Curated annotation (Swiss-Prot):
It is a multi-pass membrane protein. GO terms for cellular component: mitochondrial inner membrane; mitochondrion. Keywords: Membrane, Mitochondrion, Mitochondrion inner membrane, Transmembrane, Transmembrane helix. Residues 91-95 are mitochondrial intermembrane. The keyword Cell wall biogenesis/degradation does not apply. It comes from Drosophila melanogaster. This is Transmembrane protein 186.
């Protein structure tokens, strides 16, 4: 047995397989650490008691309006061949197809622009007991409710932002760690339950 081991030259061993065997445990440990960190953060937020700081009752109406463009697109796409067939059969005038398509496309464009305007609109803001972590519940482009956790130290107050918003009733929520990640807050249409804490976090 020893003679067979001595005959095997180390140079003949496939170095790529050796390197892959050495790298795989390190990658597995890194992925396991990242997964454990995500699970820990999720479990921590699940067992944390949250208190509502801000709420906007009309957020459900905004979400429904954002989802309406999907039905508009389906109705326009499905009804166009039917209107065209009826026009070819002489049941409808030739202008009916143009009118139907114009109404459908115009409505779809209007709803899409409204969805872009209401994207990342915050409906609820929660704070934990230690007041060092916020949970934002907002509406995405498709009208679905999304939630994200933000540390209070990562918030950029209004007095530290470069240029104020052109719309006075819209206040942007900016982060120090990611300048491209922004959320929208409606001051006039929302209800603030803790005014002192709200102004301390987001400004006047």
């Amino acid at each position: 047995m020893l003679e067979l081991l001595c005959r095997v030259s180390p140079a003949r061993l496939p170095w790529r397989s050796c390197m892959s065997l050495a790298i795989q445990p390190a990658q597995r440990r890194r992925f396991a650490t990242e997964a454990a960190g995500k699970r820990t953060e999720t479990e921590k937020s699940a067992f944390t008691e949250w208190r509502t700081v801000y709420s906007m009752p009309g957020i459900r109406l905004v979400a429904a309006l954002s989802r309406l463009k999907v039905y508009q697109a389906v109705i326009t796409a499905a009804g166009t061949p039917i209107v065209f067939a009826l026009g070819s059969a002489g049941q409808l005038s030739t202008d009916a197809l143009a009118i139907y398509a114009a109404i459908g496309v115009t409505g779809l464009i209007t709803l899409t622009l409204a969805s872009y305007a209401s994207s990342n609109l915050v409906g609820f803001i929660y704070v934990n007991e230690e007041q060092d972590l916020l949970k934002l519940a907002y509406v995405d482009f498709w009208g679905r409710r999304q939630e994200t956790l933000i540390e209070t130290e990562d918030l950029l107050p209004s007095w530290e932002q470069g240029s104020p918003s052109r719309l006075r009733f819209v206040s942007p929520i900016c982060l120090r760690s990611d300048s491209k990640r922004r959320y929208k807050l409606l001051n006039r249409f929302g209800h603030v339950s803790d005014r002192q804490l709200f102004e301390g976090l987001f400004g006047n």
